[in-house]
Amino acid sequence: MPSKEKIVVIAGPTGVGKSASTLPLAREFGGEIISADAVSVYRCLDIGAAKPGMEDRRLVPHHMIDVVDPDEDFDANIYAAQARAIAQSLHESDKRVFVDGGTGFYIKALLYGLFTEGRSDPELRDSLRREAAQLGSHALHDRLKDLDPPSAKRIHPNDAYRITRALEICILTGKPASAQQAAHGFEESPYDVLFFCLHREREILYQRTDQRVDQMLAMGLEQEVRGLLENGYGPELKSMQSIGYRHMCQYITGALNYEDAVTLMKRDTRRLAKRQMTWFKAYPEIRWMAPDETEAMRREISLFLE
């Protein structure tokens, strides 16, 4: 039986310091980085996604960043297909593959695949989107509460994209999307994986996420969002529902004052970090590391890649 191709994953919650660990390790071992971040795939969403700078990308090639425009459809299925193709190309070129990110569902999709019952119907999807435009996403969210309460609890009432997708799966399959995901055991991974997850004390992590928000605002997040809106990328788009972009849209459109928008942005960033930690704790194969344990990670990677 042929040996599996090897992948090193360095995951963790937002603000923990993943890139500062992954970049030097990938460079040292002759690797390239596949990003696993649900916001970084969108072009023009730069500050709020905290994308690596061009100098970092010059030092180590990064993939799955700036893949689609803000108004294009993108999900974990698309991510998995594209990321797996990149991983195969890198392996064929004798490059080491490093995966860096905090979007656990994308990482799981890359490593293990996704459930296949979530079929799609473009006509049904367009109909649901028109309904959302006419009645508002909250009306569809109420409908989702009846058909799939767990998904409704997980999805924000303003997130029209995810609401319509969950409804589409419910209608097409007759089963809640949440039940299908829970029942799916995922396929055996085609990769041999060394999986690290970085962690910090909760209070320190939350201090860092608050500082991260302040830094994004100082870098011009509001101006970036205004530019996106002026270019026709509306608040209803999936990309614009991301943390930071959603809050600045609400401020710019008058739904929130600036102080409240910033307060909610910090709160929601902390909540995201907490959810991400909960997600990664479900992986029994993870090696938990503090961000400053670079030498320990280096030793394990060296042994793994031999």
From Swiss-Prot:
Catalytic activity, as annotated: adenosine(37) in tRNA + dimethylallyl diphosphate = N(6)-dimethylallyladenosine(37) in tRNA + diphosphate
Keywords: ATP-binding, Magnesium, Nucleotide-binding, Transferase, tRNA processing
Binding site for substrate: T14, G15, V16, G17, K18, S19
Protein origin, superkingdom: Bacteria
Binding site for ATP: G12, P13, T14, G15, V16, G17, K18, S19
Record-annotated site: Interaction with substrate tRNA: T103, R125
Keyword Iron-sulfur attached: no
Cystine pairs: none
Cofactor: Mg(2+)
Similarity section: Belongs to the IPP transferase family.
Record function comment: Catalyzes the transfer of a dimethylallyl group onto the adenine at position 37 in tRNAs that read codons beginning with uridine, leading to the formation of N6-(dimethylallyl)adenosine (i(6)A).
HAMAP family registered for this protein in UniProt: IPP_trans
NCBIfam families membership: miaA (TIGR00174)
Subunit description: Monomer.
Protein name, entry field: tRNA dimethylallyltransferase
Gene responsible for this protein: miaA
